[in-house]
Amino acid sequence: MSILNIPCRVALGAAALLAAIAPVSAGGDSERGRTLYESRCIACHSIDTNRVGPLHRGVFGRKAGGVSDYDYSPAVKNSQIVWNETTLDRWLANPERLIPGQKMGYQVSEASDRGDIIAFLKKQMQN
């Protein structure tokens, strides 16, 4: 291997790594996300009111545990996490791994489903 090829290989490797860790919701389908939200999330959550889980309107940029009239677990209240595409993706993939001791007992295993749900939630910021 030529020494001239090393910078190219490093650049390609870095680009591949960045693509692999980019938020999955960047190209999410918000309409499909609405359908997924209505079939998977609505039993516990609502966009505008607290239910078993906290409301979701305004979730982007909000600190985890930040809805004042919802009774969060101490783990969530003390987590210091701020919700964005990456943290929501990690949360939906495995809430207990992100915040041990939290109360949500549901996971979304498919990355494309998480991305679509996140795109739907993000769109609610505009409505």
For every predicted segment, state its role:
Residues 22-26:
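Sec/Tat signal peptide C-region and signal peptidase I cleavage site
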Residues 2-12:
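Bacterial N-terminal signal peptides that target proteins for export
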